[in-house]
Amino acid sequence: QSFADVMKAEGLKETSIRIYLTLIKVILNYARKMNYVTYLVHPFVLFKMPISNIRELDLSVDELKRIRDVKLFKSVHIMARDIFMLTYYLGGINLRDLMEYDFTKGNCMRYIRHKTRNSKKNENEIAFTIQPEAQAIIDRYISENGKLVFGKYKSYEKVYSLVFRHIGKVAGLAGINR
């Protein structure tokens, strides 16, 4: 417990302390399992892990509709909202997968997630029909090669930055303040 108190006194946040202590506990348990060390009393027997703060990240249907319907005037806000809503309409698609997809393949979307593409597990293809709400947004940004182009924001990093810099402002304009 005193080690956790020292870390807290040095300015570490609860989440960092949890991560460090969890890693130490894993190492100690492994060492005991491999008979590298023995304990009369396990070092963590009386220790209580710091509780992690739970942030509410989900939006209600009403809040989502307010984001969709809010009147926006700046093009960066409109674009950030469009990308946000498109990822929602496409089942939570990862931004990287969204930007790599060729939308000239028809109204049935099929892809393998970039994140799991090279994993040793089975490559699970994701397939679903593109709904009209999503198609309307796609039609605004589709290029000749079938990829989506968001104005001057061409790379994944630039588009990611655009969305995360402006979606909070869009939510605020929609009356969502949390």
Language-model segment annotations:
Residues D5, A9-P43, G91-I93:
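N-terminal DNA-binding recognition helix of tyrosine site-specific recombinases/integrases
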Residues E14, Y39-L95, M99:
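Basic, Lys/Arg- and aromatic-enriched nucleic-acid-binding interface segment
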Residues S16-L23, M79-A80, V159, V163:
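Hydrophobic (often cysteine-bearing) scaffold residues that line and stabilize catalytic clefts
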Residues V45-L46, M99-R140:
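Conserved tyrosine-mediated DNA breakage-rejoining catalytic core shared by Y-recombinases
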Residues S52, Q135-H166, G172:
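Major-groove DNA-contacting interfaces characterized by cationic-aromatic clusters
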Residues K65, Y88, R96, P132, ...:
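Feature representing long, continuous alpha-helical segments
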Residues D69, K74-S75, F164-R178:
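Short, basic (Lys/Arg/His-rich) helix/loop patches that form interaction surfaces
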